[in-house]
Amino acid sequence: MINIRKTHPLMKIVNNAFIDLPXPSNISSWWNFGSLLGICLILQILTGLFLAMHYTSDTMTAFSSVAHICRDVNYGWIIRYMHANGASMFFICLFMHVGRGLYYGSYTFLETWNVGVILLFATMATAFMGYVLPWGQMSFWGATVITNLLSAIPYIGTDLVEWIWGGFSVDKATLTRFFAFHFILPFVIAALAMVHLLFLHETGSNNPTGISSDADKIPFHPYYTIKDILGAMLLILTLTLLVLFTPDLLGDPDNYTPANPLNTPPHIKPEWYFLFAYAILRSIPNKLGGVLALVLSILILMLVPFLHTSKQRSMMFRPISQCMFWILVADLLTLTWIGGQPVENPYMIIGQLASIMYFLIILVMMPVASTIENNLLKW
């Protein structure tokens, strides 16, 4: 009898994606982050669902409903902090996953890469709206500042902002719709993740060498299932340590003050995973210019496949490109640091230089480095 997993209409889909899938024999731990992102998403949807059972999306009660979850609901505090810190773990995995794609040339799978960039945008939008829900000071002012950026769009800007707000300022209507969107978007992300996998399985995985691995494939199960379980255990361990020992390490103390439209916090800043983009936004004195730079800082990822000038796919055997990549990583860390600092010298000038460097590395230095390497190899 033929195995049921290969014949059953539903089970054969799972089988072809997670069991009998032929995978390269040499993919490293950098290939674990895809499955970790899946785990993060499931965890966020589950914890979010339980939070939504007790949360109220009204300006008068939102803050106290979160306090109620932490104080009165059975294990509410752990659910709340797993959700908040789970978002941080999600973004750590996302940045690692994108970095892996950049380093090993996985962006040459065009459809997979572009769906991935859309996933990144969707996740950032979801996280932003989630940050508004506790209705603390940073929630309110973060929402005000970021939604206000849309007013920089010529002609329709002001109308667009008021349409998103549902009034003339961030208020009850804004909070209610943000809750609605924050609830629905993770399911959109889950659907997009399936499309992402669908496109990936059309081509098969890349590997560290960037060379075709068709001649040497191994089944996904048991080799990569056991490897993914190890990654998952490390992820859950890290998250548990964060939640149980320092749950507020990555949060902002200002968000423990209820939202007050009459009192602006001294330093308005988003969560740590948006600081690099926030630094790029602030480094341009012009409002529209800043908004464009902010969007382009992520959208530029879609250009990367067209800027690939090397005759090799991966950076594994390209030392000059490796240097460029790690300079880019250092630059992003610098931008993250600057995004959390006040707008004054020397931070302003450092932020401006780091922003210029960011675009310069991706648009100019990396393609030039690749061309130099091609010439060194006499290709």
Curated annotation (Swiss-Prot):
This entry's comment on the bound cofactor is: Binds 2 heme b groups non-covalently.
In terms of Gene3D superfamilies, this protein maps to:
Cytochrome Bc1 Complex, Chain C
Which Pfam family is an annotated match for this chain, by its short name?
A: Cytochrom_B_C
Protein keywords: Electron transport, Heme, Iron, Membrane, Metal-binding, Mitochondrion, Mitochondrion inner membrane, Respiratory chain, Transmembrane, Transmembrane helix, Transport, Ubiquinone
What are the recorded Gene Ontology BP terms? Answer: mitochondrial electron transport, ubiquinol to cytochrome c
Give the binding site residues for heme b b566. Answer: 97, 196
Q: Where does a ubiquinone bind?
A: 201
What terms describe the molecular function in GO for this protein?
metal ion binding; ubiquinol-cytochrome-c reductase activity
Report the membrane topology from the UniProt record: Multi-pass membrane protein
What's in the GO CC field? mitochondrial inner membrane; respiratory chain complex III
Superkingdom to which the source organism belongs: Eukaryota
Cofactors demanded by this protein: heme b
Q: Does the keyword ATP-binding apply?
A: no
Q: Which residues cross the membrane?
A: 33-53, 77-98, 113-133, 178-198, 226-246, 288-308, 320-340, 347-367
Identify its protein family. Answer: Belongs to the cytochrome b family.
Quaternary state and partners of this protein? The cytochrome bc1 complex contains 11 subunits: 3 respiratory subunits (MT-CYB, CYC1 and UQCRFS1), 2 core proteins (UQCRC1 and UQCRC2) and 6 low-molecular weight proteins (UQCRH/QCR6, UQCRB/QCR7, UQCRQ/QCR8, UQCR10/QCR9, UQCR11/QCR10 and a cleavage product of UQCRFS1). This cytochrome bc1 complex then forms a dimer.
Q: What does the protein in this record do?
A: Component of the ubiquinol-cytochrome c reductase complex (complex III or cytochrome b-c1 complex) that is part of the mitochondrial respiratory chain. The b-c1 complex mediates electron transfer from ubiquinol to cytochrome c. Contributes to the generation of a proton gradient across the mitochondrial membrane that is then used for ATP synthesis.
User: What's the further remark here?
Assistant: Heme 1 (or BL or b562) is low-potential and absorbs at about 562 nm, and heme 2 (or BH or b566) is high-potential and absorbs at about 566 nm.
For this entry, the protein name equals Cytochrome b
